[in-house]
Amino acid sequence: METKALWEKLINKLKKEKLIDQDIIEEYIVTSELIKISNTEFVILVRSNLGVTILNEFKEVFVYEFKSVLNSYVSVDFLTKEIFEKNTKKENKKEPINTVLSENALTFENFIVGSSNKQANLAAKNVVANPGMSFNPLFIYGDSGLGKTHLLQAIKNQAELNGKKVLYLTSEEFTKRIVNALNKGDLSEIEELKTEINSNEFFILDDVQFLSKKDKTNEFFFNIINNFTENGKQLVFSSDKTPELLNGFDKRMITRFNSGLSTPINALDIPTAKLIIEAEIKKQGLKQKIKEDAVVYLAQNFSDDVRKIKGLVNRLLFFGIQNDLGHIIDLEDVIDLFKDTPSANLGLLNVKKIKEVVAKKYDVTIKAIDGKARTTAIKNARHLSMYFAKIILNHTSTQIGAEFGGRDHSTVLSAISRIEKLIYKEKEFKKIVESLKNEIIGK
């Protein structure tokens, strides 16, 4: 969208939604000019210093309206024309910043977003676009291997691309620097370190839980937090648990952690795990094609964290080396390849759980369900398990066949059809099916 058209649209939205007094809109907004610096940075040129002061009171309204139009967060600054031109001249005199990221850099572009992490991703983008505003500090928590470090690195990289000065440290690096300064026995060393950290516009600290019970480090840390928040500079922290569950920190530190925004990265859901597997396969350059149901199988059974996914793809690459380029990796291949790998049981809804619940109901074994015996109880248990694999897990008939002793897809379709007919004809059987389904999905 052209800048002029964007500005007109924003003004019309502001008038319509009445979040700002109409007199202010006419006096200070309509008479202003929108300048696009980049896709994530805009400056609004205001006629007077008074106008700048007034519009700054509505900065969050502008950020919200830009988000509603552009579908992404942007930074917005209000300046007079004189100040803007003065700043532009200063910027032109600066040495150019090297903004070229390495191919393997962790960025927002290569962070796979799904329902398990979309809140954290949105919050991370927001603090880059609007540092030091509402979400300060930003506290991202979740188990190891879910992408916290990737998001923190993405914040660092994007903020630096935007020309911000950023310090990123692990808690181990942070502690080591403080201890080294303290060991020198000179207070000036501590002050120098404090000054160095405070000179940044972003301070990003990974794995703050490891600062637990480090009193001297935490005293220093608390002073840093105060300086950044008081000066409108952005803090970003990560941890394996929420602030409330952190042990070994005094109450004032927990209060500080909670004073901005705490947002989780949850366990990977199957669709997100599938996207990450596909992205990693593309990145690693697997030569052979791989069928979608094979990828889904991996996502459902082995992809409880990102690091494990990289290991899975490495095994696929090695498998590919051993086979012709024309070989298409299918479900049977991956089932055989990972048969000795413990299942992560992602989301706890899987074929194994279905078989366990149904086997218990019909008093048969899982081995019997997978086998060839055709007594009434075993046949009903087998067919019902296949039916649930279809309606609950949305598995393909080929995939179901592979998971039930290597049966072909026509056998699976026949079994599912038989169960559907029984549900339609027999009310008691329908009740049994509903009861088992609720038990499987945890209702």
UniProtKB/Swiss-Prot annotation:
Protein's GO biological process: DNA replication initiation; regulation of DNA replication
Entry superkingdom: Bacteria
UniProt: ATP binding residues: 145, 147-149
Region Domain IV, binds dsDNA, residue ranges: 321-443
Entry's localization field: Cytoplasm
GO cellular component: cytoplasm; plasma membrane
Chief localization: cytoplasm
Signal peptide start-end: none
A Pfam family of this chain: Bac_DnaA
Acyltransferase among keywords: no
PROSITE patterns assigned: DNAA
Domain text: Domain I is involved in oligomerization and binding regulators, domain II is flexibile and of varying length in different bacteria, domain III forms the AAA+ region, while domain IV binds dsDNA.
Family: Belongs to the DnaA family.
Function per UniProt: Plays an essential role in the initiation and regulation of chromosomal replication. ATP-DnaA binds to the origin of replication (oriC) to initiate formation of the DNA replication initiation complex once per cell cycle. Binds the DnaA box (a 9 base pair repeat at the origin) and separates the double-stranded (ds)DNA. Forms a right-handed helical filament on oriC DNA; dsDNA binds to the exterior of the filament while single-stranded (ss)DNA is stabiized in the filament's interior.
PANTHER family: CHROMOSOMAL REPLICATION INITIATOR PROTEIN DNAA
Protein name according to UniProt: Chromosomal replication initiator protein DnaA
Originating organism: Mesoplasma florum (strain ATCC 33453 / NBRC 100688 / NCTC 11704 / L1) (Acholeplasma florum)
Gene designation per UniProt: dnaA
